[in-house]
Amino acid sequence: MRYFLIILFLITHLGAQSTIISGFISDSSSGEALIGANVILQETGQGMATDMNGYYVIQDIVPGDYVLMVSYVGFSLRKEKLTISEGKSIKLNIALLEEVVELSQVEVTAEQLQRKANIQPSKINLSPRMMKAAPALAEPDLFRTIQALPGVLTTSEFSTGLVIRGGNTDQNLILLDGVTVYNPSHLGGIFSNFIVDGVKEAELIKGAYNAEYGGRLSAVLNIISREGNQKKFEGKANLSLLSAQATLEGPFYKGAWILSGRRTYFDQIFKKNPNIPPYYFYDIQSHVYSDITPKDRLSLSFYNGIDDLLFGTFGLAGRWGNSTLSTQYRRVFSEKLIGNFLYANSLFFTEFGLGGSNGLNSDNQIDDATVAANFSWFKSSESTVKFGAQLKNLGFLYTNTFGDSLQFKIETQPKEFASYIKLK
């Protein structure tokens, strides 16, 4: 631990020696961070795209006068005049205004071709707008959108299972705000768990994924929740053929919150028909954050999705679902070093019974507690070093009873540790 702190101190100290422009890019209407915004110095072409936190760093700048250009699709171009002094760093947070994109004359200009060093193959970023525009069954669905992408197949027309480049559906790593979701589907795989109005972005990596991801063979789907509107309170609701949905959001102490929920209503429509089992499912997805200081952010994410089936005629009862809870702390140690710390818990369970309390009952449970630390060190304008570690405490429980008699019980509690370092 002592050596680790020494390394952090050295990185922080080294990061303070060069001329740097750094900061966060956000949406002016809501305060949400903009991922992938382009930040470039007009005179030199130096710049980068913002990371998952909306953070950017431009280094090794020669003293002089510059124009900083910030652009993002759907937002107006922002230009800032800057004067750079030797050895002096500038922290500049910029909020972009939304703009209607007009199709007009396109003028393409270019200077000397530069080497593209940050290309990642097989990576696709999906926005809520793309999810809502894609064909879907009953209502917009993230997994249905992904199934329309190249290299992605499905097991059947009625399944949201993702078969990516020949892998099985259980070989994909599904993450929601850094937390593993073990069974992200409802109604036997017909609908996915995630509420589109509560999703900020979904990143699909179909192969050659980065060192920080592990534990699966096929692909990675990293889902990021919306952060909420920091400027004002607002809400919306809609009704589809499948469910009723609502989303509320608003400002919180130096931050924002958002709450999304949905529930199907088939059980209410057919409750007078004894031949149709009263089945329903619901999802609740929320996120809240607070910028405690300009360098520190604390956030909390929660998800709960349950399927419930009760068919009294045959004594059949079933209940299964997922629940995740995560706490994240982000710290900007210096212009060049940013760290993210995570504590998370993920639970997946199934409960099935046939014949009531005197019949056959089966319970299955996966409990995942995770602690992780990830760092990004912007070493230079040409390279970024990412490193981190993760510890998982897993619990697997499977029991089967017949009446009051325990048929069998299987319980294991393995642990996993992983660390990584990569140069980008």
Where are these regions (language model features)?
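Short, acidic, small-residue-rich periplasmic hinge/interaction motif at the N-terminus
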Residues: 26-30, 37-42, 71-75, 85-135, ...
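Extracytoplasmic beta-strand/coil segments of soluble accessory domains associated
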Residues: 134-137, 143-183, 200
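Short, acidic Ser/Thr/Gly-rich low-complexity loop/linker segments typical of extracellular
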Residues: 44-55
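Periplasmic-side early beta-strands and strand-to-turn transitions of outer-membrane beta-barrels
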Residues: 229-231, 251-322, 350-351
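N-terminal periplasmic accessory domains that precede
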Residues: 90-94, 142-145, 160-162, 189-195, ...
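Face-selective signature of the C-terminal outer-membrane beta-barrel domain
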Residues: 289-306, 319-424
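Short acidic/polar hinge/loop motifs at secondary-structure boundaries
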Residues: 57-60, 133, 179-206, 274-279
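Hydrophobic, lipid-facing positions within transmembrane beta-strands of outer-membrane proteins
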Residues: 160, 217-219, 233-235, 242-246, ...
